[in-house]
Regions:
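Patatin-like phospholipase
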Residues: 1-466
Length: 466
């Protein structure tokens, strides 16, 4: 069955809507079944998102494209929770060089108490950098052994043991600093590139998402689904518009994907091979024009794809580049603000990081003076037992949702985090309280152990969220 299925619950929805999805890393597991539920009554015309919301947005766009294809469409999205439950952590695969650092991060996530967290971090650090720990331990250990052998007394033995302990700490700390300053920087400031690593037999999250997009779209052509495909679905069905945010760190500005055709960016093949699946790279290198750098830089460069040839997986990955956890996406362009022609001709490397740094909730994406379809939005919020009775709520009156909650913080770490969040989210927060916006935002509240950076959520927690 490849044509419209009148008997399917997704066959012919009478209503049309737009949807915008907020970012939130693993909090995005709440989206698939919410989209499935909406898809029973609505056809999605315009779909937008940021970060994890961008992942859900491309999945929704692919499902809308494949709505009438057997085992594809929203039937495919309905199976996502069962896949994520046992596999979420395994999808985040650090590079081999950064695996010890990632294991320290995971150990900290799994610990339930402050004391347990300290013990877990220490054990993971020593286990991950055991050679550096051993080399640091050796001098003091030798002093202690020699003192014991010659009967040097407890003072010399104690000195040797203290020296060994100090050496162990110094060795591990030195290796941690080296990993952060060298390995992490070399991985474009992210532990996980997104694709399967040599030590693993499982897909990384980019591999999984690329496959999900094709399966939801019913795409069996072997090439990735593109924004151009969404603009011209088969059988004369209406076009699907998809948009997402990304952030150019070197330019200190956001971009909406797909970019306009005059963007002037190029990508270098070997760099992108580290973050995109082979079949995606095969498509890009055959569809995108080669670029010859005027200054003769080494490498194999291609023009960034125009909207018609931009794969959905590339847009999603550029939006989902959570700093330090997921590596940034490199592009290159010339800087025409420079005075010297020789300098203007040189390619400058630009890192694209998480779209949530610029706008984590781009509810403005599809605004029009005279909208002809409603825009729904899903916001992922923090749970507060004094404020939230329901896990999901909508403004119930004209004044509901017009004010922002007062949210205290603790300590220096909380202060620094709140500074960052205030600078990053103030515009989204204010916009979400405006009349005409707040009435169409569904708020999903999550507890501290749910969503966010909690990569170690068990299957039961994930199923509860969805």
């Amino acid at each position: 069955m490849t044509m419209a299925d009148q008997g399917s619950r997704f066959g012919q929805p009478e209503k049309i809507c737009d949807i915008v999805l907020k970012g939130g890393i693993t909090s995005g597991v709440v989206y698939p079944l919410a989209l499935v539920s909406l898809a029973e009554k609505y056809r999605f015309s315009n779909i937008g998102g940021t970060s994890a919301g961008a992942m859900a947005a491309v999945a929704a766009a692919a499902a809308e494209y494949g709505r009438h294809i057997e085992n594809a469409g929203f039937d495919r999205l309905a199976r996502i929770p069962g896949e994520l439950g046992p596999n979420l952590l395994s999808m985040f695969q650090p590079t081999p060089a950064l695996k010890p650092l990632f294991d320290i991060f995971v150990a900290a996530l799994k610990a339930k108490t402050k004391t347990g967290r300290i013990i877990a971090i220490t054990s993971a650090a020593i286990g991950g950098y055991w050679l550096s720990a051993l080399l640091g331990l050796l001098p003091g250990g030798l002093v202690a052994l020699i003192a014991l052998a010659i009967g040097g007394g407890t003072g010399f033995v104690a000195f040797g043991m203290l020296l060994a302990l100090a050496g162990l700490v110094a060795g591990v700390v030195w290796r941690l600093v080296k990993a952060a300053n060298t390995d992490l920087v070399g991985s474009d400031f992210g532990l996980c590139p997104g694709i399967r690593q040599p030590y693993s037999s499982r897909d990384g999250f980019t591999d999984w998402l690329a496959r999900l997009i094709d399966e939801a779209a019913g795409n069996e052509t072997g090439r990735p689904l593109t924004f151009g495909d969404l603009a011209a679905p088969p059988d004369g069905r209406p076009a699907i518009q998809l948009a997402m945010m990304t952030t150019s760190l070197m330019e200190k500005r956001p971009y909406t994907l797909p970019m306009p055709e005059d963007h002037r960016f190029v990508f270098e093949k070997s760099e992108w091979e580290r973050i995109f699946p082979e079949r995606v790279m095969a498509f890009l290198t055959t569809q995108c024009d080669r670029f010859t750098p005027p200054a003769g830089e080494a490498g194999e460069y291609y023009h960034f794809p125009d909207p018609a040839r931009l794969p959905l997986i590339v847009g999603a990955r550029m939006s989902l580049s959570f700093p330090l956890l997921i590596s940034a996406v490199p592009l290159w362009r010339r800087d025409f603000t420079l005075l010297e022609e020789a300098e203007r001709n040189k390619l400058r490397r630009c890192l694209f990081s998480d779209g949530g740094l610029s706008s984590n909730f781009p509810i403005h994406f599809f605004d029009r003076l005279l909208p002809n379809t409603p825009t729904f939005a899903i916001s992922l919020d923090d749970y507060d037992e004094k404020r939230n009775r329901d896990d999901v709520w909508l403004p119930a009156s004209s004044g509901s949702g017009s004010q922002l909650p007062v949210q205290p913080f603790d300590g220096l770490g909380g202060f620094l985090m709140r500074l960052l969040m205030s600078a990053k989210d103030w515009q989204d927060n204010l916009q979400s309280t405006l009349p005409g916006y707040r009435e169409r935002i569904a708020h999903v509240v999550l507890k501290p152990e749910e969503g966010g950076l909690n990569l170690t959520m068990d299957e039961a927690t994930i199923r509860k969220l969805v």
